[in-house]
Amino acid sequence: MDVEDSDKNSLINPLRIFKREILPLLADLRLAIALLLIIAICSISGTVIEQGESIAFYQENYPEKPALFGFLTWKVILLLELDHVYRTWWFLSILILFGASLTACTFTRQLPALKSANRWKFYNKKQQFKNLALSAEIETASLDSLEEILQKRGYKTSKEGDKLYGRKGIIGKVGPIIVHASMLIILAGSIIGSMTGFLGQEIVPSGETFQVKNIIDAGIFAKSQIPKNWSVRVNRFWIDYTPSGGIDQFYSDLSILDKSGEEVDRKTIFVNQPMRYHGVTMYQADWAIAAVKVRVNKSPVFRLPMAQLNTEGGGKIWGTWVPIKPDLSEGVSLLAKDLQGNVLVYDTSGKLVASVREGMFIEVSGVTLFIDKIIGSTGLQIKADPGIPIVYLGFGLLMLSVLMSYVSHSQIWAFQESERLYIGGKTNRANVTFEREILDILDRLGSDENISLEKQKQLFSDFSEGIKTSEN
């Protein structure tokens, strides 16, 4: 028997500790606010600090001397995992703890409040009406007339003998619960996205086909999201320029190819207009010059890759070297800064000869050089986040629940004692509107019961004094 009691106590004690110690702590509003502030700070850091970049990038942009803000260096960023904030164990733990706090608050406060508001309550003492902010006494009025008036105004009523209770706007009590539920859905979507999503980048020349391989950030369960059964072909990449020579828009004509190489989808994307296929979204993010096609004298047209040069902040420039002798002992240099078709030609001594356009010939260092075409590369950001639809659902419910929360929960009580009717009410918001409604109900009740004009004036005067007293 003692052993059985000991086993029961070992099971009961942790449950008792949870209910008495842990649950009240989780449901504490101060904890929820603190966690919300921490999440906001972490989100800001993840927005300010570039996510998913290489170590070299952070070493260059966040050096040890001088440290940003006096403490933020590349070592601190890597130590605290600020280079991928939204996928760190500590950030996900904070989200889970915040979700637990919302859940505890819902079950310990919001649901009991809804249950209490949904109960039929009756007042049968004059003192109960005096304790209400709005109350009045009427002679020669009946509960039946009051019940009919309340029902016409959308109140749900219940009568028990000489007592009446009416209420409306119970949905306003449901609103806060749905607010919590929608926030939990948003948190769930964020966690799912962090654990199963990925982010990739590809620089692909026009005319080439690629599969997503350059993954720069991914969740621990993201493997199934990375496309393996289809590839992408860049049919064409081009840039529209303004009359002044500035870039107006980037365009990429993309095709989705199945395993057999057949086209199953096609779309031209540009900035803020991505392509979506099987949960993967491809954004137009960057561009580069991949290569230039040239011909030397009577040789066939051949393709030379172009590399981006370091201009120390002087803008983007790509260059290549064209051999003009079979032993590769001499060559001329070509430079290009955009896809408008202009190429700068330098001779073997490094002297600028001329600026030529695509489709033109030029004599340089004893050879005839033909510039056939500049080939651009599109920079694509490739992303999958299965949690986004869940987050959108949560935000949709959140907006709906906020509107629901603004619905006033109004309650009216009445008690008949001989020829005297006691009426009182309260609401959780829009007090002025509720006061006007009560006055109108009293007006209708007085008219229906043929109460004299002088008596109505006295009634409304007393009621107004009660309102002023409650406001003071």
From Swiss-Prot:
InterPro entries, per database record: Cyt_c_bgen_Ccs1/CcsB/ResB (IPR023494), ResB-like_domain (IPR007816)
Transmembrane intervals: 29-49, 88-108, 174-194
Keyword Membrane (UniProt): yes
Topology in membrane: Multi-pass membrane protein
Domain of life, source organism: Bacteria
GO biological process: cytochrome complex assembly
One cellular component term from this protein's GO annotations in UniProt: plasma membrane-derived thylakoid membrane
Localization annotation: Cellular thylakoid membrane
Assembly mode: May interact with CcsA.
Family (UniProt): Belongs to the Ccs1/CcsB family.
Protein name per Swiss-Prot or TrEMBL: Cytochrome c biogenesis protein CcsB
